[in-house]
C-alpha cells in the first residue's frame, strides 16, 4: 500500500522507478 501511494504521489516518474 505504501509503495503504491508513493508511486501515485510521484505522478509517473516514481511509478517507473518503483517498477
From Swiss-Prot:
What are the protein's UniProt keywords?
Membrane, Mitochondrion, Mitochondrion inner membrane, Oxidoreductase, Transmembrane, Transmembrane helix
Q: Subcellular location, in the record's words?
A: Mitochondrion inner membrane
Q: How does it sit in the membrane?
A: Single-pass membrane protein
The biological processes this protein is annotated with in GO are: oxidative phosphorylation
| Origin superkingdom | Eukaryota
Task: Reply yes or no: does the keyword Cell inner membrane apply.
Answer: no
Q: What function does this protein fulfil?
A: Component of the cytochrome c oxidase, the last enzyme in the mitochondrial electron transport chain which drives oxidative phosphorylation. The respiratory chain contains 3 multisubunit complexes succinate dehydrogenase (complex II, CII), ubiquinol-cytochrome c oxidoreductase (cytochrome b-c1 complex, complex III, CIII) and cytochrome c oxidase (complex IV, CIV), that cooperate to transfer electrons derived from NADH and succinate to molecular oxygen, creating an electrochemical gradient over the inner membrane that drives transmembrane transport and the ATP synthase.
Q: Which family does it belong to?
A: Belongs to the cytochrome c oxidase subunit 6A family.
Annotated protein name in UniProt? Cytochrome c oxidase subunit 6A2, mitochondrial
Q: Which gene encodes it?
A: COX6A2
Amino acid at each position: 500500500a505504501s509503495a503504491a501511494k508513493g508511486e501515485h504521489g510521484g505522478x509517473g516518474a516514481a511509478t517507473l522507478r518503483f517498477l
